[in-house]
From Swiss-Prot:
Binding site for substrate: V298, N299, T300, G301, R302, K303, R304
Task of the protein: Plays an important role in the de novo pathway of purine nucleotide biosynthesis. Catalyzes the first committed step in the biosynthesis of AMP from IMP.
GO cellular component, one term: cytoplasm
Binding site for Mg(2+): D13, G40
Residues annotated as binding GTP: 12-18, 40-42, 304, 330-332, 412-414
Reactions catalysed, as given in the entry: IMP + L-aspartate + GTP = N(6)-(1,2-dicarboxyethyl)-AMP + GDP + phosphate + 2 H(+)
Keyword terms of this UniProt record: Cytoplasm, GTP-binding, Ligase, Magnesium, Metal-binding, Nucleotide-binding, Purine biosynthesis
UniProt source species: Corynebacterium aurimucosum (strain ATCC 700975 / DSM 44827 / CIP 107346 / CN-1) (Corynebacterium nigricans)
Pathway(s): Purine metabolism; AMP biosynthesis via de novo pathway; AMP from IMP: step 1/2
Protein name (record): Adenylosuccinate synthetase
GO molecular function: adenylosuccinate synthase activity; GTP binding; magnesium ion binding
HAMAP family given in the database record: Adenylosucc_synth (MF_00011)
GO BP annotations listed: 'de novo' AMP biosynthetic process; IMP metabolic process
Amino acid sequence: MAAIVIVGAQWGDEGKGKATDILGGKVDYVVKPNGGNNAGHTVVVGGEKYELKLLPAGILSENATPVLGNGVVINLEALFDEIDGLEARGANASRLKISANAHLVAPYHQTLDRVQERFLGKRAIGTTGRGIGPAYADKVARIGIRVQDIFDESILRQKVESALDIKNQMLVKMYNRKAIEPEQVVEYFLSYRDRLRPMVIEAELELNQALDEGKHVLMEGGQATMLDVDHGTYPFVTSSNPTAGGAAVGSGIGPTRITTSLGIIKAYTTRVGAGPFPTELFDKWGEYLQTTGGEIGVNTGRKRRCGWYDSVIARYATRVNGFTDYFLTKLDVLTGIGEIPICVAYDVDGKRYDEMPLTQSEFHHAEPIFETMPAWDEDITGCQTFEELPQKAQDYVLRLEELSGCRISYIGVGPGRDQTIVRHDVMQDQ
C-alpha cells in the first residue's frame, strides 16, 4: 500500500491537525516526520478542544499507531507532559512509538536558543525559544544526541561532555552566562529512560513493513512550506524540511511510496513571527480575520499576522511539494465580509511576477496585485456537500482551485471534525 503526506502550504497554522484527525481514523499509522514542540495543532473532537505541540494529531485516532519519526527533535519533558495531559482527559497516548534515530533537545539547546535571540535583538528570527534550531544544528554538526543514546550511559555521557565543551565556551565567553554541568544534563536524560524504553522502535523498518502488508500510513508534516529551511522565506524559517520531500527523509519511507501529497491551505493567509508577508493586513480586516478566525498561536500565544489569500505562494507550494490535492480550511471565516481580495500576482519595482521572485530581496519588496470576488452572507457551518454552499462560496473555491493549480478535495466550514465538505476522498486513491 502507498503512503499519504500532509503538508502546510503557507506559513503554518493552516489546520493540519484537523486534516490529520479526519484521515487518521482511516489509516494504520500516523507519523510526524519533522519538527519538535515548536509546531502546534488544534483538534476539536466531540466538542473537546485539544492543543497538541509535539505529538502528532493522529494520537487522538484510536485506530492508528502514532509515531515520532527520525526527523523529529524531541524534548522529553515536553513529550511526557503532553502525554500525561492527554491521558488525564481520557486519551490513550501511551501507545506512541518513537524512532530510535530521532534526536533529543537538551536543556542547553533551550538555553542557547533564548540567549541567542536576546543577543540578536531587533535582528532576531522570532523563534519559539524551545531549542529546536540548536538541536537541528547539532544534528547536522554530528554532535547531536539521539533517542538510542540514552540507553547506553557511557555513550550518553561522552556525547554530552563533548557537546558542552563547545556550548559552555559560547555561554561563558560570548553571552556572559554560567557554564552548564554535564552531569545535570546526563541525569536529566536518564530520568526519562525507563518510561521511554517501551516506546522506542526501528521506525523505518516497521513503517515499510506495514506498507508491504497493505496497511495505510499517513505522514503529518509540521510547520509549512514557506518555513522550509530550503524552500521557505529564508532566514525566517524553521530548521528542518516540512515539505513533502522532508517527510520521506524524516520517516524513512521512500518517496516512490507516497501517492498522495495533500496540501493544507487557509482561505486567507496567516503568519507568526518575523519575515516578509506580501498580503498582510494592518487595518480592520486584519483584526477581523484575527478575531473571527481565532488566530492565536497554539505554541507561542502570539497573535498571528493576517492577510488575504496569496495564490503565488499556493502555486509555489503546489510545485515544490507535488501536491495532488488541497484541503481548504476556514472558509466560514470569510462569510459576510462583502468583497474578498485574492492576490493573483506581485508587483516588484514596477514589474509583474506571476510566480515567486528569484531573490528574497525581491520578495521583501513584493506588493500584491489583487482581484476581488463577492463574499456570501449565508451561514455555511452546517453545509455537508459542495452543492449546499452558496453559489458565491462555490465560485470562490473554484477560483482558488484554478489559481493554485491543484484540485481542492476538502473544505473546512468550521472547527469541528464533522464540519468538513469532502469533494474527493483521497483514501479512494490508495
